Amino acid sequence: MKYLRLFIAIIAVTLFEGCVKDEHSSHDESTLVRTGQIAPDFSVELLDGREINLSDLRGRTVMLIFLSTTCTDCHAQFEDIARRCKEQSVPFEILAISRGESREATLEFANNYGLECDLGIDPDKSIYGMYATMYVPRVFLIDSEGYIKGLTVEYSPAEFDSLWQKALQLVR
């Protein structure tokens, strides 16, 4: 009995450790662009009907956010963003892109948070596919010259705050 408990404990620890390593490994493996690289350019249709290229934003710091309207982490992150935008003027561009979703679902999401940032739709995930293969929310911080200066995968308040602070430093 004593050996059975020990065996079960070892198996449990091994499985838990494997899950943790796999998660971070798959985050890395699913990220197609890295810090220090030029952000891939794209054209996206915004909810207001305009079309914008990422390269149109050169000269400005950009926080590029990929989201899904059904993702609970995305909702938590946008609650955080809405709060920050109410507390202070945001001196950098926020470009959010809903991947694989309809205009209607994305518009409802934007209205829930009173978002005033540019919000685009990527119904076939082709833009998202330039940056990653899975996991949202995913945030890329892009400097005024188009280089990726930081990124986060999924939502962690501490990691997002760190990236937000870095964005504020880039515009100073």
Report each predicted region and the residues it spans:
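N-terminal targeting signals for export/organelle localization
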Residues: 1-41, 161-165, 172
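A short beta-strand-turn-helix
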Residues: 42-62
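Conserved helix-turn-beta segment immediately C-terminal to the redox Cys motif
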Residues: 60-61, 76-97, 111
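Short pre-active-site segment immediately N-terminal to redox-active cysteine/selenocysteine motifs
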Residues: 60-62, 67-70, 135
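Conserved redox-active cysteine motifs that mediate thiol-disulfide chemistry
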Residues: 66-80
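Short, internal strand/loop/helix patches
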Residues: 95, 107-145
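Thiol-/selenol-based redox modules, centered on thioredoxin-like
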Residues: 141-172
